[in-house]
């Protein structure tokens, strides 16, 4: 994970830009300059597709935590009001056979899910939130996973 870090300064490095829809002006606004103290642990981490791929596998198979802690985090519960195939553990989302997590904040959204049976990982990063700050990363992940692994999806 050479290109992942916890942001401590306003703004993002390099040429990366993120956009959110402003319903008043009916235009996309650049949300790139953000104060990492605001999201803190909920969104100040910056990473790349190539770093998130091995992280998703380690998150779901272990190697980051002690075995007992990993076993506890893998226990999951159904989410109220959601289909039965969606479950949440301790910092993990289970979508049927897929294990991983997602996040959306300030013009950016990500999905990273690992499919243990196939040793496959799908990572989606999107730098735009659409109307009402809705992300397309979930929709993209659900579509790609259904095309590549139809036998492992419940959607």
Where do the protein language model's features map onto the residues?
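Active-site helix/loop module of the DD-peptidase/beta-lactamase fold
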Residues: 1-18
């Amino acid at each position: 994970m050479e290109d992942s870090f916890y942001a401590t300064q306003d703004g993002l490095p390099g040429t990366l830009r993120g956009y959110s829809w402003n319903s008043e002006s009916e235009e996309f606004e650049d949300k790139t300059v953000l104060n990492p103290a605001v999201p803190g642990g909920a969104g100040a981490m910056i990473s790349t597709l190539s770093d998130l791929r091995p992280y998703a596998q380690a998150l779901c198979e272990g190697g980051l935590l002690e075995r007992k802690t990993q076993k506890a985090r893998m226990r999951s519960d159904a989410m109220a009001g959601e289909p039965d195939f969606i479950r949440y553990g301790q910092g993990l989302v289970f979508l049927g056979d897929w294990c991983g997590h997602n996040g959306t904040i300030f013009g950016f959204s990500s999905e990273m899910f690992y499919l243990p049976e196939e040793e496959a990982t799908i990572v989606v990063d999107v730098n735009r939130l659409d109307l009402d700050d809705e992300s397309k990363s979930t929709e993209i992940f659900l579509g790609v996973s259904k095309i590549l692994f139809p036998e492992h999806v419940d959607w």
